């Protein structure tokens, strides 16, 4: 997606060889027009996949996921990173390691919001090592539902996430694929 790549080049900051800061339009301040366009790309790519629900992981995936859900006229479910007293234990849970934060968390899904007939599209802001996406997929599979695909806003193609997900048979669609990061340099997959 050329518009997204341009925003990354204009406003993104490669803080290291593995960390890209895009907080001015994606995960701190959000550009709703860009998110709407991102939703359009995901809708167009996944329109034949018979999606029943959009899933995302709190919190940075919420903006692109809600725009995708709006455009597909589907409900969106937010997978929680922390246990909540209001979920009453009737949940699916799996442990996920966060690359960005360097810690483990319990990804949680209320059983109330998924059934075995569901065909789930997982939307996330970043794909690096694939841990978050795999965790979300485990929750979907534990319920008996199916993962129809994964929509990623920004993929770090130099990390193993895509390869791992594709080896497990997932349809991964990324809007911006980064080939290389260096302090002050961002290169896209050609």
From Swiss-Prot:
BP-aspect Gene Ontology terms: purine ribonucleoside salvage; xanthine metabolic process; XMP salvage
Main location group: cytoplasm
Residues at which 5-phospho-alpha-D-ribose 1-diphosphate binds: 128-132
Location of the protein in the cell: Cytoplasm
InterPro entries per UniProt: PRibTrfase_dom, PRTase-like, Pur/Pyrimidine_PRTase, Xanthine_PRibTrfase
GO terms for cellular component: cytoplasm
GO terms, molecular function: xanthine phosphoribosyltransferase activity
UniProtKB keywords: Cytoplasm, Glycosyltransferase, Purine salvage, Transferase
Catalytic activity: XMP + diphosphate = xanthine + 5-phospho-alpha-D-ribose 1-diphosphate
CDD domains cross-referenced by the UniProt entry: PRTases_typeI (cd06223)
Pathway: Purine metabolism; XMP biosynthesis via salvage pathway; XMP from xanthine: step 1/1
Top-level EC class: transferase
Keyword Transferase: yes
PANTHER family given in the database record: HYPOXANTHINE/GUANINE PHOSPHORIBOSYLTRANSFERASE (PTHR43864), XANTHINE PHOSPHORIBOSYLTRANSFERASE (PTHR43864:SF1)
General function of this protein: Converts the preformed base xanthine, a product of nucleic acid breakdown, to xanthosine 5'-monophosphate (XMP), so it can be reused for RNA or DNA synthesis.
HAMAP family linked: XPRTase
Family: Belongs to the purine/pyrimidine phosphoribosyltransferase family. Xpt subfamily.
Protein's UniProt name: Xanthine phosphoribosyltransferase 1
Source organism phylogeny: Bacteria, Bacillati, Bacillota, Clostridia, Eubacteriales
